């Protein structure tokens, strides 16, 4: 059972209307592995493995459904590509997205899979205004490069992490290599993503995440790079953070 409740129109500081409209136009394609979201489908297994290992290590969890009892928030959840695996691992999952079309797609797919996910059309600021209880884990995946003000957005997101909890971030670095591969290569040459999906000036450096989340009372681990090998058509984790990377932040328990 899923839910989607919020006004049809959102007017919040973090929202970039052009970005919301961009993803609304292709919302129906989220679960098609050969669609415009094909790169996310290829990237998802390595990302999910990293998140599962990170969360299990942090909370001392194991088993087939190790996330039983955890509350996980996926901000900018899109069509639910991460929410559903988190729910299958036992978590109580809340997914929020500024694009109502994304929430509708995610809700329908979760219902078809028999998964209970709390989907909401909205943004992080609304959860704060509604005094939502903080979450054990907040996922901030491929969304900060699409918001109006990444710094303010990240500080707000930190407020939604409970003491002793985690935030896991994933985004694209603002480097010449990222411009060449993630924008020119992926969008203009290979056509893996619609042209204009990413704008170079909106890409986010690890130092920006570190500054914002430290302001939000969190400590940061070193970034982990995610690289694509065109010969094997596979993504892998490594030290190269010049294009895709992930970062883990912890909020002190005290």
UniProtKB/Swiss-Prot annotation:
SUPFAM superfamilies in the cross-refs: S-adenosyl-L-methionine-dependent methyltransferases (SSF53335)
An annotated Gene Ontology molecular function: 3-demethylubiquinol 3-O-methyltransferase activity
Reaction catalysed by this enzyme: a 3-demethylubiquinol + S-adenosyl-L-methionine = a ubiquinol + S-adenosyl-L-homocysteine + H(+); a 3-(all-trans-polyprenyl)benzene-1,2-diol + S-adenosyl-L-methionine = a 2-methoxy-6-(all-trans-polyprenyl)phenol + S-adenosyl-L-homocysteine + H(+)
Q: Which organism is it from?
A: Maricaulis maris (strain MCS10)
Positions of S-adenosyl-L-methionine binding: 47, 76, 97, 141
| Pathway(s) served | Cofactor biosynthesis; ubiquinone biosynthesis
Query: What keywords are annotated for this sequence in UniProt?
Result: Methyltransferase, S-adenosyl-L-methionine, Transferase, Ubiquinone biosynthesis
**Does this UniProt record's set of keywords contain Glycoprotein?**
no
Q: Which InterPro entries match?
A: SAM-dependent_MTases_sf, UbiG_MeTrfase
One GO BP annotation is:
methylation
State which Enzyme Commission number(s) the record gives: 2.1.1.222, 2.1.1.64
The family this protein is said to belong to: Belongs to the methyltransferase superfamily. UbiG/COQ3 family.
Query: By what name is this protein known?
Result: Ubiquinone biosynthesis O-methyltransferase
- Classification of source organism: Bacteria, Pseudomonadati, Pseudomonadota, Alphaproteobacteria, Maricaulales
Q: What is the annotated role of this protein in its UniProt record?
A: O-methyltransferase that catalyzes the 2 O-methylation steps in the ubiquinone biosynthetic pathway.
């Amino acid at each position: 059972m899923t839910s989607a409740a919020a006004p049809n129109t959102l007017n919040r500081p973090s929202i970039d209307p052009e970005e919301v409209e961009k993803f609304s136009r292709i919302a129906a394609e989220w679960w098609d592995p050969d669609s415009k979201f094909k790169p996310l489908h290829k990237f998802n297994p390595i990302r999910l493995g990293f998140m599962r290992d990170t969360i299990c290590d942090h909370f001392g969890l194991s088993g087939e459904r190790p996330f039983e009892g955890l509350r996980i928030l996926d901000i900018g959840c899109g069509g639910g590509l991460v929410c559903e695996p988190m729910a299958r691992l036992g978590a109580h999952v809340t997914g929020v997205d500024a694009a109502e079309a994304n929430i509708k797609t995610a809700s329908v797919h979760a219902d078809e899979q028999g998964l209970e996910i709390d989907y909401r059309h909205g943004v992080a600021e609304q959860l704060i205004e509604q005094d939502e209880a903080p979450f054990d884990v907040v996922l901030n995946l491929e969304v900060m490069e699409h918001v109006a003000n990444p710094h303010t957005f990240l500080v707000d997101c930190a407020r939604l992490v409970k003491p002793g909890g985690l935030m896991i971030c994933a985004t694209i670095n603002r480097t010449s290599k990222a411009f060449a591969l993630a924008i020119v290569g992926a969008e203009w040459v290979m056509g893996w993503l619609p042209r204009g999906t990413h704008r170079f000036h909106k890409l986010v450096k690890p130092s920006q995440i570190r500054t914002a989340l430290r302001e939000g009372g969190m400590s940061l681990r070193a970034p982990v790079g995610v690289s694509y090998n065109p010969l094997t058509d596979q993504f892998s984790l490594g030290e190269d953070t010049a294009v895709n990377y992930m970062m883990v932040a912890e909020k002190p328990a005290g």
